Amino acid sequence: MLVISGWLNIYAAEYNPDIHNSIFSFNTSAGRQLIWIFSSVGLISVIMLLDFRIYDSVSYLFYGLCILLLIAVLFFGKEVAGSRSWFSLGSFEFQPSEIAKFGVVLAMARYFSKSTRKTSELRIQITGFLLFLVPMILVLLQGDAGTAMVYGSLVFVLFSEGMHPVILIGALVVVILFILTLVANQLFLIIGIILFAILIIGLVGKSIRKIMLAIVTALASIGFVLSVDFILNDVLKPHQQKRVMSLINPNADPLGIGWNVTQSKIAIGSGGLLGKGYLEGTQTKFDFVPKQTTDFIFSTIGEEQGWIGSVVLIALFITLFLRIIYLANRQKSGFARIYGYGVMSILFAHFALNIAMTIGLFPVIGIPLPFFSYGGSSLWSFTVLLFVFLKLDAHRMQVLQRI
C-alpha cells in the first residue's frame, strides 16, 4: 500500500497538465519508479527462495563487502549535491550506503546472537557500537550526514540488548546542548550548567562519588558547549552549516537555503483539512517545492490530500512499525529478533527525519521516506531489509543454525 501510494504521489509531484505524460511513461520519475518496483518484486522472490539460514551465515562476509564499497566510493564515487556517495555506471547509479544498512544490521544481529557473554556487558556493547560506528564514519566522510544519522539510530539495538538507559539520556543531552548553544548566549548557558551542577551536588549529599560525577559531567558539558563553534565552522561543510542555521532562523535566507522548507510548509498548510485533490496541487504544479519526488514527497500528500491524508499516511507507517516490533518479539532465535529491531530502527529513523525535515523541525539532510520516495537504491534497500525479516519470521519455529 505504501509503495503504490508513493508511486501515485511521485507522479503527482511531477504532474504538468500542459504536457500530459502518462504515469507509465519512462520520461517521468513515476515511470522509472515502476521499473524499481517490479525489480523489487524480483528481489522479494529471490529472498523467499533462498534458505533462511544463509542470512546468518554470510552476515560478516557481506558486512566486510559493504565496508569495502563504502571505502571505494570515497575514491571512485560520483559527487552529487556535495556528497561523494554514488557509483555511476552509465545511466545506472548505485549508492552503497543504502545496501550497507542491510549489512550492518545483519552483522549486529549475528554478533549479539552468537555472543557467549551477557550482551549487556560493556565490552560486548562497545563492539556492537563499533559495528555501526565504522560505516557511519565512512558515510560522514562522503559528506552524507543524513544517512550517517540513520546509522546512528542503531544505538536502539544496543539498548534492546541491555545498554544502560543513562547512555541514551547522555546522547539526548548532547543534542539538546548543541541546539541550545546555537540559539542561546554561550556565557548564560555555561552559567546555567554550573548552577545546575551545584544544585545536583546539594541534592546528592556527602557522596563523594556522585559529587565527582556531577563535576565531571558539568565540565564535559561546558567543554562541549565551547566546542560547538569548532564543530559548526570546521567539521560541517558550508552547505551543512547553512542547513543547520536555516533551522534556527528559516527567515534569514528565505530565497536561498530556507526556500525548500518554506515552500514545503506552504504546500502542506495550503492543503487544509481535506486537501486540494489528486493532481490539483498548485505548489506542486508550478514547481515551488524542490526535490518533491524524493526528500519532500510528504508535502505532496499534505497539499493534495490535506491533514486527513497526512494522518492516514502516518498511521500506515506506525502500523508497520508496531507490526515489526510484534514480529521481532515473537522470534525464537536471537538473530531474527535482533535483526527485526535493527530493521525497525532504520525505517523509523527515515520516517521521523524525513517528516521532521519536511515540516521544518529538522535541517534538510536528504533522507527519503521509506517505500514512498522516488529512488531505486533506497527502495531496494528497504525491500531487502523488510523481506529478509519476513523470511526469518516465516521460519521462526526452526532453530537458526549456521549452514
Predicted regions and their residues:
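TM-adjacent membrane-interface loops and short helices in multi-pass inner/ER membrane proteins
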Residues: 243-297, 305-309
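Membrane-helix interface motif
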Residues: 8-16
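Transmembrane helix boundary and interhelical junction motifs in multipass membrane proteins
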Residues: 144-149, 276-281, 292-294, 356, ...
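A juxtamembrane structural motif centered on a specific transmembrane helix
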Residues: 354-403
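Short hydrophobic beta-strand that contains or immediately precedes a catalytic carboxylate
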Residues: 94, 263, 371-372
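Gly/Ser/Thr-rich beta-alpha loop segments that engage phosphate groups in nucleotides
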Residues: 8, 79, 84, 260, ...
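Hydrophobic alpha-helical transmembrane segments of multi-pass inner membrane proteins, especially
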Residues: 3-4, 8-9, 23-255, 302-359, ...
